[in-house]
Amino acid sequence: MAHTGQKLGRYTLHESINEGGMSEIWLATDEAGRPFAVRVMKNNTAFAFAERKRFNSGAEILQACQDGQFIIGYVEHGKLGDDQVLVLEYVEGSNLKLLMAAGDPVLTDDIARVLIDFTTAMEVVHDRGFMHLDIKPENVLLSRNGSLRLVDFDLAQPIPNPPRKLDRLSGTPHYMAPEQLLKQPVDHRVDIWAWGVSAYELLTFKKPFPGENADEVLRRQANRREFVRPRDVNADIPAELERIILKCLEQDMNRRYPITSVLVHELKQALYV
């Protein structure tokens, strides 16, 4: 296990700042004292084939999606000593899920810019030929100066053409599209659905399809009689923005936005940005 003061190549670990099932993220500095976020894989035994493949695949896709603005900065990945690591830019800030929980004013004062930057980050991923497959507020960092970064590419895959079934069901059910939960063929439009769920949540502080498990979420998606439109929760939401969100949340993926650039364009028009 990684520990405070441990040296991994040119990096010294200082403080654990986040932890997930597969890895732990540390604040680290290099020999020049510059800060980085170092993600250390927990289970790096000789038999952790699947975990290592997923870790490295996510790192490679992240590297391919670098844009210098909306995607978390990639530095390097590989084995340092006995540990499998991914070194990233360090962003001093918080994710959108935590900002929602804290009732941070940025989600009211600057929500238009947050939504547009969030969508633009997703557009970058799709333009590079990948689907993220884990779009949600928790995977979007907002720095103290307001810059946004999309993170966590562990589940990302190349966009299939035509759509195909995923090998396994991974992700967070509340943000999964119906075709995902039903284990039907998918493509990048599952990300567009997840963005719609996230936008609804950021604007209303409620989930559009609440449920204790995947089956309940799926039932709510299919039975729209219980669905509450965003403007019925927050009357300040512009009608055109509501229309965009509802288009992202179409049950039939063919009725959602076909490409993310159209979503970005319409969103900018709706928000006058």
Can you describe what each PLM-predicted range is?
Residues 77:
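Activation-segment/catalytic-loop signature of the eukaryotic protein kinase fold
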Residues 81-95, 99:
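Conserved short submotifs of the Hanks-type protein kinase catalytic core
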Residues 204-208:
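Structural helix C-cap motif within protein kinase domains
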Residues 45-64:
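AlphaC helix of the eukaryotic protein kinase fold
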Residues 114-115:
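Activation segment signature within eukaryotic-like protein kinase domains
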Residues 120-130:
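Protein kinase catalytic-loop region centered on the HRD/HxD motif
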